[in-house]
Amino acid sequence: MAFVKSGWLLRQSTILKRWKKNWFDLWSDGHLIYYDDQTRQNIEDKVHMPMDCINIRTGQECRDTQPPDGKSKDCMLQIVCRDGKTISLCAESTDDCLAWKFTLQDSRTNTAYVGSAVMTDETSVVSSPPPYTAYAAPAPEQAYGYGPYGGAYPPGTQVVYAANGQAYAVPYQYPYAGLYGQQPANQVIIRERYRDNDSDLALGMLAGAATGMALGSLFWVF
């Protein structure tokens, strides 16, 4: 950060309206700082021109003030601040007054200063678009044209036949097999009765013996 303009100016006090000589520095960030003297040890006040200043008057435009002894009003300038404060200044000459006026006006309106730059950065951050995505993942409705079926299919019917010819039906619940899984169907199961008594076993042996004797007689004839 560097000086834009420096020099002596007469400043009128706000209470006693007396003129006092101060050293002024205008910095490149738009701050106008004035000191007791050129050593810059004691700061009396400072003004941020881009943010605090709303108008600059020169010469006959200056209000509610009179120039110091030996100076004309054309050497005067006033810095009107946003908070209502007015800083009345007087330069060494008319040319010096105009030089200060143009420099201060430029620092107040130049967007390269820090105050305006910060506002520009905040605006760009707020209004910046979201990051670009080359291949966005489609939603399930867009990929397939319909959403997945979330419910279970209705249960099928299981029909069971006993060996005595009687049939009875029981519900059979199929688990959900996905979007393209197997659909439920009706199943038929024939279940034979288990023979575990002695009479059934004897009848089977007798029938086998009779069959063997008949076959033996047939072979004996030939």
Curated annotation (Swiss-Prot):
UniProt-annotated binding residues for a 1,2-diacyl-sn-glycero-3-phospho-L-serine: 20
Major localization class: membrane
Gene Ontology cellular component annotations, sorted alphabetically: membrane; recycling endosome membrane
Keywords: Endosome, Membrane
Bilayer topology term: Peripheral membrane protein
Domain of life the protein comes from: Eukaryota
One Pfam entry name: PH
UniProt entry tagged with the keyword Membrane: yes
Subcellular location: Recycling endosome membrane
Domains as described in the record: The PH domain specifically binds phosphatidylserine, which is enriched in recycling endosome membranes, it doesn't recognize PIPs.
Name of the protein in question: Pleckstrin homology domain-containing family B member 2
